[in-house]
């Protein structure tokens, strides 16, 4: 992320300079708040949208947009493949597409995150475009007690910090 600087968006205005090949080219990778605003800081309790914009320049190919998310310790937090049923195993016509993956609120841990975006065919495997760690953002926990942290203020390690649904049964003595 450019010597520690995080940027929430990268755009390739010149398609010849964009990651890709003769059939598909990335045009932009962005991170957005639920409101649609591009930002580099997120409240841990709120959803985060990862977005890739791409041009299909040659019709008839099947593509899967992919995001790889890394934390500040360069640990791979997750890999997400687009499973939108409308495009699953469907050859795409030429045109511009925008695919968005939503990370639920109360799921990531605090800290800096970087995002790689890829465009691939799964079967048979073929990598069409790869934009490694081009965007990034920071996740912050306000410590107000309504996140997974609750009222605990000590160090909380881990690559995710989900606020899980808990149920407790009580049996009186």
Predicted segments, located by residue:
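Localized sequence-composition bias
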Residues: 1-173
